[in-house]
Amino acid sequence: MIHPSALVHPAAQVDPSAEIGPFAIVEAGAIVGAGCRLAAHAILKAGAVLGAGVVVDHFAVVGGDPQDLSFDPSTASRVTVGARTVIREHVTLHRATKPDTATVIGADCLLMAGSHVAHDCVLGDGVILANGCMLGGHVHVGAKAFVSGGVAVHQFCRIGGGSLTSGNAVITEDVPPDGLAHGRNELAGLNLVGLRRRGVPAEAIAELKRAYHAVYRPGQGCAALAQAELAGGAYRTAEGRAFLEFFLGGKRGRFVQPS
């Protein structure tokens, strides 16, 4: 159902089962999947693609131009939002900077009020961004990570899956999977509460603890230590291997450190 006051461009694709609220705007080229709900004053810009069951709340803007001084507004790029993701009030999601590329939001995410996802970010499934969280351009956030309120993440950083970043943290370095980050690039160990809530087996948690202590040794590089641990072939769980492999990737090679 489309409210009479909504502005839906004829070139937009809106599934008949979607609900478009009062004064919402859907621009040409936007795609709204089955069962989506756009609240009053929600805005979908050209290039916004919503999977099934996505909720876009009041005054949220999906698909706005990147805040990049070199960006050409004529660039045909996208924001894709996975099924059942909830986008709350005043959230801003910016489209990618290059032609035929996308800022990607996974399925079953929750983007709380006032959070911002900049151009070219990639969020895995089940990510939660709390109120006022800000992600710079090209940030990657792994599945089921929780980024708390007021957190600022520098461009090109990676936030590992299953990690928890505490409120008002400043992150300019990579946070490992299942890590517990706080303050300014500080690490308080593993997110053990989150691991247990997700039902991660005890064997995997034990391997994560072993990997954590193997990689974080004073005065030694995390990447080299992670490579040595993997070469030993002693890690049998996906969680343990993923933790170590994280240190071999990324663009910046800098990681949050234990406080």
What are these model-derived regions, one by one?
Residues M1-S5, P10-A11, P16-S17, G53, ...:
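Terminal amphipathic alpha-helical/low-complexity segments used for targeting or macromolecular assembly
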Residues M1-E186:
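Structural signal for interior beta-strand "rungs" in well-ordered beta-sheet cores
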